[in-house]
Amino acid sequence: MSMSDPLGDMLTRIRNALGRKKDKVVTPASKLRAHVLDVLQSEGYIRGYNQVDLGDGKAELEIELKYFEGMAAIRDISRVSKPGRRVYVSAKSLPQVANGLGISVLSTPKGVMADHEAREQNVGGELLCRVF
């Protein structure tokens, strides 16, 4: 069975693992997922991730979740643009997440980046998810 929203699946796996206080979570690999994880790692929301080759051209991403004094670094992570309803924003209309305490992850012509980077580079794009 094919998955209709692979990025939404990864975000749900992360949310569920954080709720169960897991140290790691595994998800199928893709370039978009890896780019989103790069943004989450650079912003300090996860410790890191490794790509594990399973053979037959398949791979998995092993994500190391981050906790601080028993609390998860990610309080909320949600998908914004979905396969049935894409959400695009311009550089000027980028919304703030939690009054600037969280980030939005965007897919832009210059690559996947956080909202503050998109404002600096004056580019808009598809609003993939929000993290707080």
Swiss-Prot record:
Xref: Gene3D superfamilies: 3.30.1370.30, 3.30.1490.10
KW Ribonucleoprotein (keyword) present: yes
Keyword annotations of the record: Ribonucleoprotein, Ribosomal protein, RNA-binding, rRNA-binding
Keyword flag Transcription regulation: no
Single GO term (MF): rRNA binding
Similarity field: Belongs to the universal ribosomal protein uS8 family.
Quaternary structure and interacting proteins, as annotated: Part of the 30S ribosomal subunit. Contacts proteins S5 and S12.
UniProt-recorded name of the protein: Small ribosomal subunit protein uS8
Organism: Bartonella tribocorum (strain CIP 105476 / IBS 506)
Gene of this entry: rpsH
